[in-house]
């Protein structure tokens, strides 16, 4: 929502919005000319009536319920209401655009595409689900021809989008509150891809290979079967050296500053999208060295009593496993971009939603067993009703059953979580907090618990 607000105000629209929680994002929007209300009430709607030549259009996300005071008052006043996806569709469908969808990696991939296009002089407009380090925000209005957008599949609304190029990163069952089974998710993404001008897809994903006919494929496994490919030559904790191929022919090498095979795939996808837009490979190769992942993607918050504290948005088993594998590579290779070299891996994981935790309890346990120590934060319900037998304690027990030698604890609340991290961690530990809920407050809570040695808010992978 904030990315759309910023772009619309730069396009000359009068934009207002409400959020009861002050934040840096709201401050930045206010600085850009967005009128920000810090309460949500019927009075907000009344204050907007009578201003301008047309009545206001009220835009809401899937997280906003019909019982919301502003929504209810807007209906009483006969105002138009639309979903955020309708506004995003209006942007995507009316200019050349690249829309990135998929179960994992879409925020990072769309960030990388926008960053590469900007670095090579294309000046794109971007609407991303995370903070793009090169822009300092999650959205920007560019003067170039292209728009880059993250297309979120969680509520199915991406079927409204008709981009010039649709990009699919991978498919796994998720968002089980909306999709009863994998086939329903596949069908939704097929509707999205069928409505696009062309499809660029990940050949390494077996579900994509089986169910989709892409106009072009990328791979980090088989350059002979993909239009664009990168094969790792050396994997390190601070990045990857890779050979880059187009249509089976090696055309150069890459120094990717983002570690992990999942990031190599994300970078290859971004390169493929930019190459399809005609950006010279030499320009892209120069720009790759400055790539950074979006906010909350292995985001190093700083050093706390010689512990390295990192925040990550991983909340699906595959994401947790990929993030822990990358962290393990940093520990074992002796190389990392972190402020000091990590010696041990302490995973702090917050389950997100009862439905997701119930669906993937054993998969989460297997992924978390990759850590040296595990602390399970209190489950973040995201408004869901509890499910009997599903809890942080149940997940901790599942980890213990798989890996009896791994110390595992479950925290009843965030205060106890902070105390447990302080008690269980050691100097040299990489404390990796993962989840889509409020576990990202761990750094601030630790800072209150004891002064940090060195904040590193600007340091991110």
Over which residues does each language-model region extend?
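N-terminal leader/targeting and accessory segments in enzymes
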Residues: 1-87, 229-231, 251, 259, ...
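Nucleotide phosphate-binding/pyrophosphate-handling subdomain across enzymes
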Residues: 7, 165, 236-238, 247-373
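Phosphate-binding loop of NTP-binding sites
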Residues: 7-10, 30, 44-50, 62-203, ...
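Short internal beta-strands
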Residues: 13-20, 199-203, 346-350, 370-381
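Beta-strand->loop->alpha-helix junctions that form or flank phosphate-binding loops
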Residues: 16-20, 37-42, 82-89, 127-130, ...
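C-terminal helical cap/extension that packs against the catalytic core
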Residues: 32, 308, 365-427
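Short acidic/histidine-rich motifs immediately flanking catalytic phosphotransfer sites
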Residues: 50-57, 145, 426-429
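Short, flexible loop segments at boundaries between secondary-structure elements
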Residues: 376, 449-461
């Amino acid at each position: 929502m904030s990315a759309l607000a910023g772009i619309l105000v730069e396009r000359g629209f009068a934009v207002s919005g409400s959020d009861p929680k002050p934040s840096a994002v709201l401050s930045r929007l206010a600085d850009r000319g967005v009128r920000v209300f810090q309460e949500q009430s019927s009075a907000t709607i009344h204050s907007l009536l009578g201003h301008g030549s047309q009545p206001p259009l009220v835009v809401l996300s899937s997280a906003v319920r019909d019982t919301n005071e502003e929504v209810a008052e807007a209906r009483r006043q006969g105002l138009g209401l639309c979903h955020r996806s309708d506004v995003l569709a209006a942007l995507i469908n009316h200019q050349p655009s690249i829309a990135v969808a998929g179960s994992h990696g879409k925020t990072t991939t769309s960030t990388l595409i926008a960053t590469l296009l900007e670095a090579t002089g294309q000046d794109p407009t971007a609407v991303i689900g995370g903070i793009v380090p090169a822009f300092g925000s999650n959205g920007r209005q560019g003067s170039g021809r292209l728009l880059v957008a993250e297309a979120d599949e969680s509520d199915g609304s991406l079927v409204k989008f008709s981009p010039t190029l649709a990009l699919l990163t991978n498919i796994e069952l998720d968002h089980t509150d909306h999709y009863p089974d994998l086939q329903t998710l596949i069908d939704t993404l097929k509707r999205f891809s069928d409505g696009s001008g062309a499809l660029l897809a990940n050949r390494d994903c077996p579900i994509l290979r089986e169910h989709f006919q892409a106009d072009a494929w990328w791979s980090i496994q088989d350059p002979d079967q993909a239009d664009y490919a990168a094969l790792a030559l050396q994997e390190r904790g601070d990045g990857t050296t890779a050979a880059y191929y187009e249509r089976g022919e090696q055309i150069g090498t890459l120094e990717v500053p983002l570690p992990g095979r999942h990031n190599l795939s994300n970078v290859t996808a971004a390169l493929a999208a930019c190459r399809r837009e005609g950006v010279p490979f030499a320009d892209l190769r120069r720009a790759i060295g400055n790539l950074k992942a979006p906010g909350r993607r292995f985001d190093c918050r700083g050093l706390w009593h010689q512990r390295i504290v990192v925040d990550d948005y991983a909340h699906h088993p595959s994401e947790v496993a990929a993030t822990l594998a990358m962290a393990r590579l940093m520990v074992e290779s002796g190389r990392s971009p972190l402020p000091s070299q990590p010696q041990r891996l302490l995973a702090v994981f917050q389950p997100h939603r009862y439905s997701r935790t119930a669906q993937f309890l054993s998969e989460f346990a297997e992924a978390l067993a990759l850590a040296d120590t595990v602390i399970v934060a209190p489950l973040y319900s995201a408004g869901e009703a509890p499910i009997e037998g599903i809890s942080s304690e149940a997940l901790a027990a599942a980890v213990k059953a798989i890996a009896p030698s791994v110390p595992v604890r479950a925290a009843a609340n965030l205060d106890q979580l902070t105390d447990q991290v302080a008690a269980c961690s050691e100097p040299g530990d990489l404390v990796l907090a993962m989840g889509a809920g409020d576990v990202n407050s761990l750094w601030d809570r630790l800072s209150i618990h004891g002064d940090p040695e060195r904040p590193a808010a600007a340091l991110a992978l």
